[in-house]
Amino acid sequence: MKIVIVGGGISGWISALIFSHRQPNHKFVIVESPEIDTIGVGEGTTGLFSDVIDELPDINFAEFLRKTKATPKIGIEFNNWSGQGSSFFNPIDGTPTTNDDFDSFLYFTYTQNSSLDTSSLHGLLKRSNKSPYTIESGRLKDYNTALHLDNKLTVQYLKSKSLNRKNIKHISDTVFEIERDEIGTVKKIICSNHIIEGDIFIDCTGYKRIFSSKSDWVSFKDNLPMNSVTTFTRKHQESMVTKADKLKLGWCWQIPTQERLGCGYVSCDEWGDDVVDEIKSNYSDAEIVKSFKFESGKLKKSWNHNVISLGLAYHFLEPLQATNIHLTLVQIDMLCQKCIRDTKDRTLNPNVISYYNKHIDNLIEDFKNFINIHYSCDSRVKMTDYNNEIIDLLKVRGLFHEDILQAYGSCGIQLWGHTLLGLNHLTKQDCHKFLSEMNSYDEVKEVSSELEDTFTNIPFLTYKELIDIL
């Protein structure tokens, strides 16, 4: 089959690399417009991105960190979300009891430390400014880490690797027309200098969504009202933690790369328009980059006929928990493992397409609910019905593993649990009650000791030591 990827950016080039590696018998064409620049100033990932980079045979992880100026990401620090001066840490790795039916160590940690930065190995690393890397047999070994990326450098690196692949053809051109048959199947794309036919088209055109119409869009603005982003940069700070600061008109992310902080203020127009003034008053060294509007939501179908929309071409959710790159990778993995086959007929089977769309829709609903829950202390934002039920369950008896969607790529109980407790939806007395009911006190004390031993006995590199050896 001939698979045409339309659009560059991180989603386009990582798609080209993964598809061509895992589906080597197909032909791949990537069409990248020379007129479109990279939007982001900095972006965080989940641990899945590191796993993918490790899997690709022509990418050396240490080289990737060095060339892209990426830094480890061990979690997100949320400031002022449940009130001015409040703070909590949501780690990448989760607690030692994350996979148990009841995450007892999380509740125990909250009774001791409501900031939750002692619930996990990554939390202990944060407190000591250590990285989640060691040197073993002369090579870097990571302990379940994610990354902070410089978007432009990452795109350049992924593109350079893709151009060396024999089964990827790169065309620099701009699409201005799409030709479909009578039932809506795309037959060819017409560019300024090329006419390109294909069997499957992968839409990685981001907000432009050139294969879709406005009628295909499902809005989430009732529960996710943020609709504007102003990006800016700040001076470099040595850090391995994303910061998410709640402000008057929304919230601000700060992502540390090796050379700067990539930042963005996500705001709601209905709450006010003095965004730049608020940025300057909170971050005196801010250098404004650009602003753009958005609407949270998704397409009705990620896979429609022979077009598969990935990343921002399929959805937009404010970048509160690195869901964009994460979902793109989940989509690609599902397509490679369970959907794309040796022939066009087998691949475009209606039941295969339906299976894929249902799974991706469930994930987006999970992500929507999860991002919405962060605003549960802000009366201006309407909670989803699901989140009202989850908060009620939490207060009555805590959350169990099966209370949250357990599907490949979903947020999972680890992220939900830290967020709900970090937002102070429970008291310490509540947590003591739940631990007593679960007979968990002996277990959590033992787990606490084992966690401290692990942290003490492994020679984790400091931030400076890691950067110096790259």
Pin down the residues of each PLM region:
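Short FAD-binding loop at a beta-strand-to-alpha-helix junction that anchors the flavin cofactor
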Residues: 303-320
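Conserved FAD/dinucleotide-binding core of flavoprotein oxidoreductases
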Residues: 247-295, 315-326
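Glycine-rich FAD pyrophosphate-binding loop
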Residues: 20-41
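Beta1/beta-strand and adjacent pyrophosphate-binding region of the FAD-binding site
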Residues: 1-9
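Dinucleotide-binding Rossmann-like beta1-alpha1 core, especially the glycine-rich loop
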Residues: 37-131
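Long, low-complexity C-terminal extensions of enzymes
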Residues: 72, 341-470
